[in-house]
Amino acid sequence: MKNPISISYLRNKFLEGIITRLCKYLPASDIGRLFERVQIDFAGEDPRIGAYALEYNNPQALCFLIDAYPTLRRLFNEYPRMSDIRLIDIGPAFGAAGGLLAQMHRSHFLGPKLRVDALDIVADRKNFIEMSYPMISFLHSRIEDISPDKTWDIAYCSNVIEHLDNPQNFLRLLLERIHGYAVLLAPYMEEKPLSLDHKVRINEATFEGFPIISFEKLTTPAWPPTADGVARQQALIVLRGTARSKV
């Protein structure tokens, strides 16, 4: 016997039909502006959160991704062209980086197809991310609460570890869930006083004892000089995952 169609499913399909039909009566530009207003509403009760996401956080996240993409691309090329890569974006903020990766690699046109998960401890990001980037699956969890049996091929982690009291413990837990590589960005040797919510300075010593593939320093518009004119750099690090291969 087939499972009965739920009332919520029928309701959602009915509403989708109404919204789609109504949108046909609006100019395309009005629909775009309406979508941005809905994004802001979904980002949190305070509209300033959504405005911050669209005007500042997402542009910064995309700029960091542009900096890291050549490295990610080289790693993607190690996989068969027609394969699927499981990628997790950890600490995705409002999802712009993972969303763009999912859109770019939604098929095998550019090589391996990506299946993107986004993991964050902030539950309020879920609605904004899943509405803005529907190809992403959002996971509300800490890395230590993810089953060791749940693994990914590649991790992308931009400007997260400097917010942690113990980044080494986080890195160990992360690598145990990654078969391929972890690509990380973080402020390099940030001058004191550290930026808001930053807890540690990141340098080469942070990664001692870990399987480092590469460590480079870069300058990026996403991490500009301070108000006092002090130049700042980002570190771009690639680590090898330590997850056990599935038999």
Locations of the language-model features?
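A short SAM/SAH-binding and catalytic strip from SAM-dependent methyltransferases
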Residues: 154-165
